[in-house]
Amino acid sequence: MAAPQEGYPPPHSDGQQGYGQPYGAPPAEADQPVAPPPAGAPATGGPTHGGRKKRAYAGQAFEFGSGANAALGGQLPGGGTYGGYPAPPQPQGYPPVPYPGQPAQPAPETYAAGEQLGAGGYQPPGPGYPAADVSQITQQMGQMSMGGQMPGRAPGATSLNQLYPTDLLAQSFNVAELDFPPPPVILPPNASVTPSPTANCSAKFVRSTLNAVPTTNSLLKKSRLPFALVIQPFTSLHDSEDPVPIVSDQIISRCRRCRSYINPFVTFLDHGHRWRCNMCNLTNDVPQGFDWDATAQQALDRWQRPELNHAVVEFVAPQEYMVRPPQPLVYLFLIDVSYSSVTTGLLATAARCIKESLDRIPNTDRRTRLGFIAVDSSLHYFTIPRDGSESSDPSMLVVSDLDEPFLPIPGDLLVTLTECRENIEIFLDKLQEMFQNTQNGGSAMGSALRAGHKLIGPVGGKLTVLTASLPNIGYGSLEMREDKKVLGTSKESSLLQTGNSFYKSFAVECSKQQISVDMFLFSSQYQDVASLSNLPRYTGGQTYFYPGWNAARSEDAIKFAKEFSDYLSSEIGLEAVLRVRATTGLRMSTFYGNFFNRSSDLCAFPAFPRDQAYVVEVAIDETVTKSVVCLQTAVLHTTCNGERRIRVLTLALPTTQSLADVYASADQTAIATYFSHKAVERTLGSGLEQARDALQAKIIELLSTYRKELAGGSVTGGGLQFPSNLRGLPLLFLALIKNLGLRKSAQIPTDMRSAALCLLSTLPLPLLIQYIYPKMYSLHDMPDDAGVPDPATGEIVLPPLCNLTSERLVPYGLYLIDDGQTQFLWVGRDAVPQLVQDVFGFPDKSQLRVGKQFLPELDNDFNERVRAVIQKSRDFRSRGVGSIIVPQLYVVKEDGEPGLRLWAQSMLVEDRADQGVSLQQWMSLLREKVIQ
């Protein structure tokens, strides 16, 4: 048969079909997909001249000597960790994780957690204390052969993850598994248009609760599992720390109908002149210039374009993506100058920190503007002259009418950092002196917020609030609502609601004007975090809470200074919107996180932070007929350098008609993240008790469903069956119920609870899981390679993780417990003097003070290793998240101050405590309910 014209490749002779073409069908000339050349194929001829100019761009690309979608397969087997996925011929299992004492099975080397430790380290003082038994987990997991064809799976379909049942009661959970990657996403061969290992979205940007999607809503309902995405569009505070590919030629190809962006999962047709949308199937023209490098004036190799090789890309947006010129970065600081702010040292520390961070505030385009309003019972505005003016002194204007605070000349109140740099420094030096003798206890912060809204409303920007008082006069004034008698009762939930409707309605006004609010709260008394946190919640901001903060304690001052400096340096996005599109049949139904839901599917962010994650629930509205679905997140934003950009994240997932596939590919940490957001919503809507009950009911429902549908209804030998990839879920649910934000207790101050709820609904997934189930390391007997750099990577090696139970604590031990916000260094009551000497520099434990502190830098190997472990445990960047938080370290003695000890012990979520059950009781309760 003669080759078709135009140099188009002949149909396959080996029986492999181009995707989208029925088996054995003759090639449909204009509608057959076009594939990239095989890896390493030489580029074919340059542009053909003399024809129409429109096609000169594309002339180079499509004369390959090999069949469409030839053996390279469109997907590398076992692609890179960034987002590649294997496409193996055999059923792909998600193998059970090896436990101590279990016959070895290959597993990622980095997770060799739970190995028996050597005899090194600090041993017990005498024979009286047997070393803790690390594990009695010996049962080999049943590696079930699924035998033949999976029910509900089409013959010849790609084999998805295999289901490995495990008995939850027979072996304790290896907590290192909480850091494991999710079950792999297994796509059919040739699912993507290029064989790039980064063609599918990395789990650090987007995680799905289900890595195999049910084709029908009835199957999803039958599974009782949630279908949701956990989205973290930015994974670092600064672009340089985690760069993504940038498409800067302003050629953005989008589907005419559904407005999806071209991505690695589209199909090219008509000799590459058109592309078929993988969301809605519409055929679109490839834009002019798609294969042309305008800068170099030469043809481009289409298959090298970032948007066809990378699931995460950023497009530089042309003019039509702007309603107005890109917004400059604006920070208006509302600083509390009342008596409590001055006496705790907040005013002085904040002023000094802003001054020392001026060089870190993004200002590449030299348009960044700053303003300052000081707040007590009046509002104090400051005009700062330009550098080089006759007078460098700032002038202050005091406004006492809080009902209608008029604005002095706005132009002088919001000044350009570049033009007024020196005079801003002079002002910040003087600010503290202006109020050092104040006795004013009033706080008109609500009125200050309104004034700030008026001031920056025309341009938008950040209102950064630093306050150590409860707003008690003017707009939005709040009262002391906390009543210790109602803590732990059903009435407590009302204290978690806002105490003044001003904060919600004002937040919505801010969102409309592209104003975002961040709250830094420092009170040693009740401050009504529940009300104040509404401002960040609806404006894309965050609430940072520093209870009992005082600058006289260097630990407090240094923690805030580091965090606030990183906050100011963060390369936030401005005037942003987020939208998630998906394959026909799927719909985004509910959105969770700090933003304003402007329409059914559009989330508005006056500022887009870099240290938060969002959860989007997905509904299946109609039967999905495709073998692969795609979900594409787009964030349109202005960078803080004044460039309009669109960050696009495309996730492709296989579909299935089999319930076993759905369970085998479910991601336990993404599911826990989804239910964390649901629990916060339930708490604020219905109450704490209802939120806890809903969590318990949900885990019972999942266990019962699995037993009934997939375990044949059996409860063998008193066990409790669940898939091995979900075996941490009952523990995570218990830990969530016992978290500071949700647990039943009469001891938790309302502000602490409200601040915890803010974290539970904003933290990126790795930090949220750690906040729910903290990390504990045994330091006194850590292996020799722990606390020192790994020779291969240079990264500090952490000791093996321990389960959070007092059974793991030996009386002579030293342990680090870290929930990502706070670190506890637990010193056992019988710690040997040498250990205390090496770590703390005291010959006797009685001299060791407890409470927040920095570890001394001592000249011995063990002290260095302990400090390295503490530091590495704070290294969020290596875990693919941006965060300004520097966890505070508390030294706790087992026989020391009871309040501190109880706080540290509340992290041991597997123990019975306060009004919470132990893990053992919890598992017995679940089993009882499941077999009822």
Curated annotation (Swiss-Prot):
Region of interest (Zinc finger-like), ranges: 255-280
Keyword annotations: Cytoplasm, Cytoplasmic vesicle, Endoplasmic reticulum, ER-Golgi transport, Golgi apparatus, Membrane, Metal-binding, Protein transport, Transport, Zinc
Compositionally skewed regions (Pro residues) per UniProt: 86-106
Molecular functions per Gene Ontology: SNARE binding; zinc ion binding
InterPro entries in alphabetical order: ADF-H/Gelsolin-like_dom_sf, Gelsolin-like_dom, Gelsolin-like_dom_sf, Sec23/24_helical_dom, Sec23/24_helical_dom_sf, Sec23/24_trunk_dom, Sec23_24_beta_S, SEC23_SEC24_subfamily
GO BP term, pick one: intracellular protein transport
SUPFAM superfamilies listed in its UniProt record: beta-sandwich domain of Sec23/24, C-terminal, gelsolin-like domain of Sec23/24, Helical domain of Sec23/24, vWA-like, Zn-finger domain of Sec23/24
Region named Disordered: 1-58, 81-109
Membrane topology: Peripheral membrane protein
GO cellular component: COPII vesicle coat; endoplasmic reticulum exit site; endoplasmic reticulum membrane; Golgi membrane
Low complexity biased stretches: 15-28
Keyword Protein transport: yes
Entry-linked Pfam families: Gelsolin (PF00626), Sec23_BS (PF08033), Sec23_helical (PF04815), Sec23_trunk (PF04811), zf-Sec23_Sec24 (PF04810)
Binding site for Zn(2+): C255, C258, C277, C280
Subcellular location: Cytoplasm; Cytoplasmic vesicle, COPII-coated vesicle membrane; Endoplasmic reticulum membrane; Golgi apparatus membrane
Subunit structure: The COPII coat is composed of at least 5 proteins: the SEC23/24 complex, the SEC13/31 complex, and the protein SAR1. Golgi apparatus membrane; Peripheral membrane protein; Cytoplasmic side.
Summary of the function given for this chain in its UniProt record: Component of the coat protein complex II (COPII) which promotes the formation of transport vesicles from the endoplasmic reticulum (ER). The coat has two main functions, the physical deformation of the endoplasmic reticulum membrane into vesicles and the selection of cargo molecules.
Family under the similarity heading: Belongs to the SEC23/SEC24 family. SEC24 subfamily.
Record PANTHER family: SEC24-RELATED PROTEIN, SECRETORY 24AB, ISOFORM A
Name under which the protein is recorded: Protein transport protein SEC24
Gene: SEC24
